[in-house]
Amino acid sequence: MLHGDISSSNDTVGVAVVNYKMPRLHTKAEVLDNARKIADMVVGMKVGLPGMDLVIFPEYSTQGIMYDSKEMYETASAVPGEETAIFAEACRKAKVWGVFSLTGERHEEHPHKAPYNTLILMNDKGEIVQKYRKIMPWVPIEGWYPGNCTYVSEGPKGLKVSLIICDDGNYPEIWRDCAMKGAELIVRCQGYMYPAKEQQVLISKAMAWANNVYVAVANAAGFDGVYSYFGHSAIIGFDGRTLGECGEEDYGIQYAQLSKHLIRDARRNGQSQNHLYKLVHRGYTGMINSGESPRGVAACPYDFYKNWIKDPEGTRDMVEAMTRSTPGTDECPIEGIPNEAAASNY
């Protein structure tokens, strides 16, 4: 793991993250103009960072947040489509991989169902290698249709890459799912705003440590008339230490080199902090000392996860019993979100 240079090598993958200024757009033409701006930035960054293998832009960087529902549906993208064609040309020209946001991607039943919040991983030939749809939209505000699966793809120089989006990262389950599928780099693209800066910086570092995985965070910056975005795009080592982190500045860039050998060696030879291995080899020292299996215990000891798989509806009822039974709350009602007071009128 190297930081401070502009190079990369056969062993290291050069990764850049961008504090892209949150755009405020209203039409398809404006979206395509902004996509060309992103494409120009990709090509320009490669000149300044010749080792850059992968460039990552934040959630909402292509379309911004469409606070008007009509505009959101009208500007929703097809994948592949006009926006991805612009990005593909830039990736081919710069000979670089990219992660780009599409908010939203048209649902299969568009316009009868809400769009998806989507990321794509594109290779240096302009081909879409991974398309990820946000599993945990930021309710109650975000109205995206939820995705249902994480992916791992072979990325630049063979590094294994997973994509997640913003609020996804507040749930440890998604990080573990990606890591246990073999991800060596988890990319978290976000359009996160104040006041949650401290918490979001913290959790990405903690999840890198807990999952023995590189993390690259690209976050929006600036003010879009509604929210103020805190930036702090960062690249984090698999030991949870930050390699490079932006401040709040618009269009800030951080860059680091991620060693394939180091993470694979750590996962192979690490012992006391090899969290992936230890999770499914519980207590092997005590079992060896007891004359039992040297591989420890593999079975899941966590009742919540067992129950969730076996009985999802019953598990939801259990959670509602200790939280609430409706999506909204009476004490802070949000238009369009049912709360207990509204439910009692039916």
Swiss-Prot record:
Catalyzes the hydrolysis of short-chain aliphatic amides to their corresponding organic acids with release of ammonia. Also exhibits in vitro acyl transferase activity, transferring the acyl moiety of short-chain amides to hydroxylamine to form hydroxamates. This is Aliphatic amidase. It is an enzyme of class 3 (hydrolase). The active site is at E59 (proton acceptor), K134 (proton donor), C166 (nucleophile). Pfam families: CN_hydrolase. Residues 13-260 form the CN hydrolase domain. Keywords: Hydrolase. It catalyses: a monocarboxylic acid amide + H2O = a monocarboxylate + NH4(+). The keyword Hydrolase applies. Its EC number is 3.5.1.4. InterPro entries: Aliph_Amidase/BUP, Aliphatic_amidase, C-N_Hydrolase, C-N_Hydrolase_sf. GO terms for molecular function: amidase activity; hydrolase activity, acting on carbon-nitrogen (but not peptide) bonds, in linear amides. Belongs to the carbon-nitrogen hydrolase superfamily. Aliphatic amidase family.
